[in-house]
């Protein structure tokens, strides 16, 4: 299954690495990543990930990561989230 993640993470040192590490540890593979630094120092990320687990489960886990300010998940190309 393929999912799109829209994330906003704070600018703390290691925040991006923590998010990417959580995605991989939970059995998902990032197939595309777009990141843009915001004026307030936070990051706006748009990612496409592949995995067999439900996307909402990953969203809940990412929401617990330190400095993850917002997360939304949606299915890609008719896949169920």
How does the language model describe each region?
Residues 1-81:
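A conserved regulatory-domain signal marking ACT and ACT-like small-molecule sensing domains
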């Amino acid at each position: 299954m393929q999912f799109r993640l829209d994330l906003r993470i704070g600018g703390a040192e290691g925040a991006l690495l923590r998010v990417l590490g959580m995605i991989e540890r939970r059995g998902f593979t990032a197939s595309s990543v777009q990141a843009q630094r915001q004026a307030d120092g936070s990051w706006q990320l748009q990612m496409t990930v592949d995995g067999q687990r439900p996307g909402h489960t990953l969203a809940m886990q990412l929401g617990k990561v330190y400095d993850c300010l917002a997360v939304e998940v949606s299915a890609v190309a008719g896949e169920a989230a």
